[in-house]
Amino acid sequence: MNENLFASFTTPTMMGLPIVILIIMSPSIMFPSPNRLINNRLISIQQWLLQLTSKQMMSTHNNKGQTWTLMLMSLILFIGSTNLLGLLPHSFTPTTQLSMNLGMAIPLWAGTVLTGFRHKTKASLAHFLPQGTPTFLIPMLVIIETISLFIQPVALAVRLTANITAGHLLMHLIGGATLALMNISPTTSFITFITLVLLTILEFAVALIQAYVFTLLVSLYLHDNT
């Protein structure tokens, strides 16, 4: 293939015009507003999935944590739909950009931490020093716990970026191998194509799982601070 290995991460264009507008409008088409809701199978499945996800994530939260339900549901829908749209051929996946993922992770993490310091100041400070710590280990543990706290948003963003990027690069490599082997060995090319199809199905699952994992970890951080 003559394309650059990272060509799938560039902004797509159609007739010289960026098609970002169509990508941005796609979630509103996939998830219609309440005044357009019709009782059909698709809407019923969407509502059932949202209720199941919100119940699983927010059932252990108190009243302060429950106020984050709408934000977390919007977050999982945004990341999930963005990841799925990125699987379309010649499309751009914003979640492969670490800057965007950090832009989501840092404010959400900071919100949970500030909520904890505001409503549970003593409990939040107590996390920096486990109970029963020997006196000579106190300075070291405080530093370690502080570093582990500040690395949480970085871990959130890097996890999402790495998983989505790795999957796209692997699909690109296998797709290139399939085309290269068509004239050399059709049988091997067919086997590689089957592998590509299976990997594509796996990537659909990974796209949804990573959206769920990202939102679930934010929910867990919120639970620890409320």
Curated annotation (Swiss-Prot):
GO biological process annotation, one example: proton transmembrane transport
Classification via PROSITE patterns: ATPASE_A
Reaction catalyzed: H(+)(in) = H(+)(out)
SUPFAM superfamilies reported for this sequence: F1F0 ATP synthase subunit A
Molecular function in Gene Ontology: proton channel activity; proton-transporting ATP synthase activity, rotational mechanism
Gene3D superfamilies: ATP synthase, F0 complex, subunit A
Superkingdom of source: Eukaryota
Pfam families: ATP-synt_A (PF00119)
InterPro entries in alphabetical order: ATP_synth_F0_asu, ATP_synth_F0_asu_AS, ATP_synth_F0_asu_bact/mt, F0_ATP_A_sf
Membrane-topology descriptor: Multi-pass membrane protein
GO cellular component: mitochondrial inner membrane; proton-transporting ATP synthase complex
Keywords carried by this UniProt record: ATP synthesis, CF(0), Hydrogen ion transport, Ion transport, Membrane, Mitochondrion, Mitochondrion inner membrane, Transmembrane, Transmembrane helix, Transport
Location of the protein in the cell: Mitochondrion inner membrane
Role, per record: Subunit a, of the mitochondrial membrane ATP synthase complex (F(1)F(0) ATP synthase or Complex V) that produces ATP from ADP in the presence of a proton gradient across the membrane which is generated by electron transport complexes of the respiratory chain. ATP synthase complex consist of a soluble F(1) head domain - the catalytic core - and a membrane F(1) domain - the membrane proton channel. These two domains are linked by a central stalk rotating inside the F(1) region and a stationary peripheral stalk.
Family: Belongs to the ATPase A chain family.
Subunit structure as annotated in this protein's UniProt entry: Component of the ATP synthase complex composed at least of ATP5F1A/subunit alpha, ATP5F1B/subunit beta, ATP5MC1/subunit c (homooctomer), MT-ATP6/subunit a, MT-ATP8/subunit 8, ATP5ME/subunit e, ATP5MF/subunit f, ATP5MG/subunit g, ATP5MK/subunit k, ATP5MJ/subunit j, ATP5F1C/subunit gamma, ATP5F1D/subunit delta, ATP5F1E/subunit epsilon, ATP5PF/subunit F6, ATP5PB/subunit b, ATP5PD/subunit d, ATP5PO/subunit OSCP.
Protein name: ATP synthase F(0) complex subunit a
Source organism per UniProt: Rhinoceros unicornis (Greater Indian rhinoceros)
Lineage of source species: Eukaryota, Metazoa, Chordata, Craniata, Vertebrata
